Amino acid sequence: MKRIIMIYLVIFFGLSIQVAYPYWIWTPKVKKWVNPKTAIRPTPKEQFAFARSLYELKNYEEAKRELKKLIKSYPKALEAAESQYYLGLIEETQSNLYEAYLAYQKIIDKYPFSERIQEIIEREYKIAEAFMTGTKRKALGMALPVENPAIEILTKVIENSTYGPLASKAQYKLGLVLKGLMRYYEAEEAFNKVISNYPDSEWAKAAKFQIASCRAALSRGPDYDQGATGEAKDKFEEFVKEHPDAVLSRDAQKNIEDLKEKEAEANYNIARFYEKQKAYPAAKVYYDDIINNYPDSKWAAKALERLRVMEKRK
């Protein structure tokens, strides 16, 4: 029985050695056994060349492993920054856009000397645009229920290059993302920064329109806000006055008409309230205001009709 057990043990260890052996190779140069999976080339230049060759062969997972080994073993080498860049490229190629952004951002944070900084900012901006147009952040192929990553990425683009060529555009697009999420106060703040920080940019004019649009959206909430409606109308009128030939001025004029209609409706409802309370003088003030200040609205005719009804009651 002992002999049989010994035979099994010999076979087991023999197989174990056979399985394990290929992972360890004797290297005469350093005179020791090394594991190819964890081994690193003697210089960062050689390691990077090897990793890039794997990338060019589209062996992305192996390339990622070798690039990470370089960064870990030679963190201060010039090749470390380039390795981090290639990690971003691989993630982007594999459609892992948020992970690509994180990889690119590490270059700006850890390797500000890199010659690729402007290119990286541009890549980050394009990733943000992808998220703006509907791309979802995913894990294991499934969309994650998280805030639109475009907010974080655009904020970083602005931070990375406050007065760079993409800064004003990123600031404006940040406002659009927030507006699309109905975060109107934050959106208005973002648009205001376009005007204050980049007054001469091509986006400043559109930002003024968007501020008025945010105010208009607030006025359409479940609780009518007369102040927000008036402010929105004033902002649109200011925009039309300053930019009469702008394409957006036509939209602004339409918004002004809609807001006037809304103001007239609000005044009509107030007048009806006073009329029902038999406070006829107060009701007449509001009906007259509609007729005089909103003559083209549908509420003007209704106000005139109510005045005639009240007149008959005297």
Q: What are the functions of these language-model segments?
A:
Residues M6-L9, P28-K29:
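Short helix-onset patch at the extreme N-terminus, typifying the N->h transition
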Residues Y8-S16:
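Bacterial N-terminal signal peptides
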Residues V19-K314:
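Acidic, polar-rich low-complexity tracts and alpha-helical solenoid repeat scaffolds
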Residues M1-I4:
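Positively charged n-region of N-terminal signal peptides that target proteins for export
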